[in-house]
Amino acid sequence: VLTVAQIAGIQAAKNTSMLIPLAHQLNIISINISFKIKEDRVECISEITCDGKTGVEIEALCATQISLLTIYDMCKYIDKSMIISETKLVLKEGGKSGSYKAE
């Protein structure tokens, strides 16, 4: 399930410009989707780098959401009450708007 979710997240990051209006195609260098398995949840971390002046936070957020939706889709037969919550930008370096780190 997690491997399929990683692949889905990578595809989502690469295709963000087709999903989000006014987003443009970026020259993505690397995409890393990882998961932390907790007792009551799965945490997804998406890390993306690109060769350009624009940030990749929308691509990372899109990758995270699609990865989690894939897990939901593949596990809904076990529990339809799963909740996808608290998606947020944790760290951004570079880009036109500068750096950001969540508190």
What do these predicted regions represent?
Residues 2-24, 29-103:
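C-terminal binding/interaction regions
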